[in-house]
Amino acid sequence: MTDLRRKKPVRAKSLSTLAIHAGEEPDPTTGALTPPLHMSAAFRLPDFGPSLFDALTMESQQPPFAYARWGNPTARALEAKLAALEGGEAALALATGMAAVSALTFTFLKAGDHVIASEVCYAGSVELFGLHLPRQGIEVSLVDTSDPDQVRQALQPQTKLVYVETPANPILRISDIEAIAEIAHKAGALLAVDSTWATPCLQQPLALGADYVIHSATKYLNGHGDALGGVVVGPAAGIHRMRKEALVHLGGAISPFNAWLIMRGLATLPLRMARHSQSALEIAHFLDGHPAVSRVVYPGLDSHPHRDLVLGQMSAAGGMLTFQLAGGLGAAITLAERIRLFTYATSLGHARSLLFYYPTDLYVDAATYLSAAQKARIREWTGEGIVRVSVGLEDAEDLIADLDQALRARSAKGLVGPAAYAALKRIQARSAQETEE
């Protein structure tokens, strides 16, 4: 006869074990090993008494379920697993990575406060900091967080939050989490780290002193490219405050189905990250010697400017790399046309390998929230443009062969594309000028 009693919570140190067991247990009614998917929007409330009031006011950190935007059993299971993987007290799962960033900032910042943030990070995040928070009366300093002195110099009496993304999207700058945590805490500020590119398998921000760690769960945590999600992990009291103030009021609730899909993906995260990292290193070495490539940036190469920090802070270098093409935009157009195993797409962390070209004039020069000095610093990493690569789970030799044939190819669009792009920019500039006049 099947024993359907609940097991005691899993206590393990290994990420591989936690990725499979944390937050999960056999269903107490059926014995099913796969966690159930709870798609209900509403739940039967407890009888009149303390539990009912807790469900309606969310006074406890795990109140009875009342409404799916406030909490859901599937999302709660995902939160337990993510908290265990990051070594945090609690986690809040949200609809997207940007919902996670927004929940953090709008919970802990108000008009008159000051935040220091990485000048290079995910586009949605840096645009939130550079464009939207100032409109709410929140002062923002965007700095190169790979230089702790810039963080220290940017501190103000009203600094409440330091926000770091490391490795930084898309240029792969690395920031010293431990050093910045010390700087932030001495000033009475919180430190939040977006660790999406590293995952808890390669980097543990909370253990290095961060207060909160953020992920776009859409990427590596899910791993299959089929579900949006985000998460913030940190102290239980702060996470509970975010749940009451940001999740309930701003509405970035994760779909239970997406939570279920991400939880499914997490079971293989340690294995996938090892494969991503191994293959990315092989591809980085190949590209580093290719005649069509002028520069490769990958944390696993000795040539990376922050290689010593990588060795001390990360257990492996991850699945993301960038490279510059000797042939510039024309070569990038040809590359996008001729790849076969790689897919030309902007996301990352999938089983399928992806790449995308970022022209510096479009993604850096046009950023109104960056100073001329900041743009010049970023150009030291990007040149006129970079190809960002998300190395998937295919065989590394097959991926190298695909890149090699595409890099050696020539195409008509690649020949005429740069001139057409320059003409389009002139037309857009003239149109903008006429609109201003």
Q: Which residues does each PLM region occupy?
A:
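Glycine-rich beta-alpha junction loops
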Residues: E24-P26, M39-L45, W197, K219, ...
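Conserved N-terminal alpha-helix of the aminotransferase class I/II PLP-enzyme fold
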Residues: A42, D47-A99, G124-L131
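C-terminal core of ALDH-fold dehydrogenases
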Residues: A12, A19-P35, G330-S371
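PLP-dependent enzyme catalytic core of the Aspartate aminotransferase-like
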Residues: T2-D3, E89, G130-L131, E139-S141, ...
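N-terminal glycine-rich, Lys/His-bearing helix-loop that initiates the first secondary-structure elements
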Residues: M1-Q62, L415-V416, A420-E437
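Short, well-ordered beta-strand elements within core beta-sheets of diverse protein domains
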Residues: L261-L271, G318-A326, R388-G392
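Conserved PLP-enzyme active-site core in the AAT-like
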Residues: D3-R11, A19-H21, E25-P28, A90-H290, ...
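Conserved small-domain helix->loop->beta segment predominantly found in fold-type I
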Residues: L281-L354, A372-W381, P418-K425
